[in-house]
């Protein structure tokens, strides 16, 4: 299989995150473990090499249930202990099609939905942590999409008790189809002018508040500008996601008890109360 090199993916992803966050979010990989084997499914099943190749070739359907046994991985690699000792903050798992990993999942005391149901019985970690599921069949753009959904889940939780215009997250993700004339930055799936999921190459022009978010947050000045897909790469997944992540607020101060630097929540969910 002509799949991507894990180191190249990791370097590209980390570089994009540094750029998008204005240098605030910097990953450091402290250990890499290469596992020669297939992960266990939730019912204990393991693929063997021939069966898996048959699945890839379409000769046999993928095994069901597809979900991986996260607890087997957590126990095998002492994840809870490492998090509790502050030796690691999160875990990245690079795998192959049909491996059964979520794009992201959260564990630890007070863990909440992070594009997947929270991992129960992981309080021994003593703090929240995220496990990212990446695929070396895909590219950096898809890694950024996983990160984008993680950001969406965490910011949705962060602002859940605020309503109306006080819920700045809801304002951030507005796009033209749902809020005519009031498009902001959109979501990871919906650009300001998108008509449907993944519609990042839509050439139509719409009025957007994206510059107000990028340059003036939290002291909005009512700045708007006409934008279209040329702003975020004409449908290029990676370019759109960098553009979107770049617009996430990253300034000092607080409003309604919530930090104006959203990256600190996204990178470390222990900064928020659940």
Stretches with model-predicted labels:
Residues 39-42, 102-108, 144, 152-154:
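A short acidic (Asp/Glu
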């Amino acid at each position: 299989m002509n799949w991507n090199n894990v180191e190249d993916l990791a370097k590209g992803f980390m570089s994009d995150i540094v750029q998008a966050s204005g240098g605030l979010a910097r990953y450091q990989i402290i250990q890499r473990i290469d596992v020669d084997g297939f992960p266990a499914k939730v019912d204990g099943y393991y693929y063997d090499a021939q069966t898996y190749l048959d699945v890839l070739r379409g000769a046999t359907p993928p095994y069901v249930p597809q979900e991986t046994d996260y607890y087997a991985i957590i126990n095998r690699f002492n994840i809870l202990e490492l998090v509790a000792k502050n030796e690691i903050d999160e875990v990245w798992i690079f795998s192959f099609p049909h491996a059964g990993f979520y794009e992201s999942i959260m564990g630890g005391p007070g863990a909440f939905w992070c594009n997947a149901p929270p991992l129960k019985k992981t309080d021994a970690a003593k703090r929240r942590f995220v496990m990212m599921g990446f695929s070396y069949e895909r590219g950096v753009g898809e890694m950024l999409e996983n990160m984008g959904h993680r950001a969406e889940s965490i910011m949705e939780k962060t602002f859940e008790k605020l309503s109306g215009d006080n819920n700045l997250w809801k304002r951030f993700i507005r796009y033209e189809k749902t809020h005519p004339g009031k498009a902001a930055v959109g979501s990871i799936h919906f650009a300001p002018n998108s008509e449907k999921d993944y519609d990042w190459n839509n050439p139509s022009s719409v009025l957007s508040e994206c510059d107000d978010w990028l340059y003036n947050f939290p002291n909005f000045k009512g700045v708007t500008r006409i934008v279209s897909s040329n702003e975020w790469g004409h449908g290029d997944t990676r370019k759109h996601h960098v553009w979107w992540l770049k617009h996430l607020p990253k300034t000092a101060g607080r409003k309604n008890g919530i930090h104006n630097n959203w990256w600190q929540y996204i990178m470390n969910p222990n900064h928020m109360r659940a």
